Amino acid sequence: MNPVQQPAQHKCPASSLNPPHPKRAQEAPDMGLYCDNFMYQQHNLHPSHRATNFSIGDFTHQANPYLWLGGPGVNNSPSYSPTPAPYIPPAFSAPQRQFLANSAAFGGADLGWMSAASQEELLKRVRPPYSYSALIAMSIQNATDKRLTLSQIYQYVAENFPFYKKSKAGWQNSIRHNLSLNDCFKKMPRDENDPGKGNYWTLDSNCEKMFDNGNFRRKRKPKSETNNIKIAKREEDHVSPKGKESPPMITPSSPKELSPTGHSKCPSPPTVTYTPCLTNFIGSMTAVDSATMNRQGPLGLLNELSQRNLNGLSSFISGSAVDQSPEHQDSSLFYNRSPYYSSLPTSNQKQPPYLQQLHPQQSPLYQGRY
């Protein structure tokens, strides 16, 4: 027996490779009734039996999000059958209408295909795309005298827009705020012959064009006004720049101290009151000086320097012993420091009597060195 020829005897019939699927073929038209834009692809069916005439317009989104603003109805797309499949099953289908035709109150809504209760419920849930300023302007423009009171504006909004019937407190406060803050609405007092409560509100003639499309367009400031504000701010920043201001420095020659001729007044040196401690210190230093002068040897230069320092200290005391007025006593240490640091005394300065007694006479040996 030839093993090569054995698989040829067990060949499967050709009909068993492609079994029929009658059930799936029958389901495709039924699915077209419920799935409008759904394409069910079957790989076992011939492509000639499939409709491929879909267009982009069938999948476009409606530009207007509100149903009652007047958009076209639902577009039916063709399915597998030559006739287009309806959006609703045939048992419940009805002739399609445009959702909203133009009406006087809302700018377009013909809900004849819905019951009255369904229409009212739909309008209560959908908020009108108008601002509160636009609602006020619409109510005033539709009035005969072009003026309304606050209660009449409330009544107009509630009657023409059912959305505002459910919660009156919130939107009524917004209406009042817009009337008081918006410059386009002017308050008119009542006449004497017109009894009633509340003033009238009217629309400014200069703002009528701001409500052309129903919505309120905010009024822009003129360019000249904005330019003037910018120039004023720049001038203020230039005159007094922030962060660059420094506190005024206190100088000895302030404008208050200047004389009428423009020269500053120089105060005289104040007096210094001496304590007994300072007197004892001077006496001890004099005693040390007299003791060192008696020594001989290499300490002669040191004795000379100490003698000069003592003479400078005595000159400081003698120069400040002049009597001065009491108003200069507080600043005595500030104006009278320079004589203290001068080590060489002047010839014109005289020592007080009590200091002359403390200093001994210099010997002729050291007088020649000066």
From Swiss-Prot:
<feature type="compositionally biased region" description="Low complexity">
    <location>
        <begin position="349"/>
        <end position="370"/>
    </location>
</feature>
<feature type="DNA-binding region" description="Fork-head">
    <location>
        <begin position="127"/>
        <end position="221"/>
    </location>
</feature>
<keyword id="KW-0217">Developmental protein</keyword>
<feature type="compositionally biased region" description="Basic and acidic residues">
    <location>
        <begin position="232"/>
        <end position="245"/>
    </location>
</feature>
<dbReference type="GO" id="GO:0048264">
    <property type="term" value="P:determination of ventral identity"/>
</dbReference>
<dbReference type="Pfam" id="PF00250">
    <property type="entry name" value="Forkhead"/>
</dbReference>
<dbReference type="InterPro" id="IPR001766">
    <property type="entry name" value="Fork_head_dom"/>
</dbReference>
<keyword id="KW-0524">Neurogenesis</keyword>
<dbReference type="GO" id="GO:0045893">
    <property type="term" value="P:positive regulation of DNA-templated transcription"/>
</dbReference>
<keyword id="KW-0221">Differentiation</keyword>
<keyword id="KW-0539">Nucleus</keyword>
<dbReference type="GO" id="GO:0030154">
    <property type="term" value="P:cell differentiation"/>
</dbReference>
<keyword id="KW-0804">Transcription</keyword>
<dbReference type="GO" id="GO:0000978">
    <property type="term" value="F:RNA polymerase II cis-regulatory region sequence-specific DNA binding"/>
</dbReference>
<dbReference type="GO" id="GO:0007398">
    <property type="term" value="P:ectoderm development"/>
</dbReference>
<dbReference type="GO" id="GO:0006357">
    <property type="term" value="P:regulation of transcription by RNA polymerase II"/>
</dbReference>
<dbReference type="GO" id="GO:0009653">
    <property type="term" value="P:anatomical structure morphogenesis"/>
</dbReference>
<dbReference type="InterPro" id="IPR036390">
    <property type="entry name" value="WH_DNA-bd_sf"/>
</dbReference>
<dbReference type="GO" id="GO:0000981">
    <property type="term" value="F:DNA-binding transcription factor activity, RNA polymerase II-specific"/>
</dbReference>
<protein>
    <recommendedName>
        <fullName>Forkhead box protein I1-A</fullName>
    </recommendedName>
</protein>
<dbReference type="GO" id="GO:0007399">
    <property type="term" value="P:nervous system development"/>
</dbReference>
<comment type="function">
    <text>Transcription factor. Essential for ventral specification of the early cephalic (head) ectoderm during gastrulation, playing a role in the non-neural versus neural cell fate choice. Binds to DNA via the target sequence 5'-[AG]TAAA[CT]A-3', with 5'-ATAAACA-3' being the preferred binding site.</text>
</comment>
<feature type="region of interest" description="Disordered">
    <location>
        <begin position="1"/>
        <end position="28"/>
    </location>
</feature>
<dbReference type="InterPro" id="IPR030456">
    <property type="entry name" value="TF_fork_head_CS_2"/>
</dbReference>
<keyword id="KW-0805">Transcription regulation</keyword>
<keyword id="KW-0238">DNA-binding</keyword>
<dbReference type="GO" id="GO:0043565">
    <property type="term" value="F:sequence-specific DNA binding"/>
</dbReference>
<dbReference type="GO" id="GO:0005634">
    <property type="term" value="C:nucleus"/>
</dbReference>
<feature type="region of interest" description="Disordered">
    <location>
        <begin position="212"/>
        <end position="269"/>
    </location>
</feature>
<feature type="region of interest" description="Disordered">
    <location>
        <begin position="342"/>
        <end position="370"/>
    </location>
</feature>
<dbReference type="InterPro" id="IPR036388">
    <property type="entry name" value="WH-like_DNA-bd_sf"/>
</dbReference>
<dbReference type="InterPro" id="IPR050211">
    <property type="entry name" value="FOX_domain-containing"/>
</dbReference>
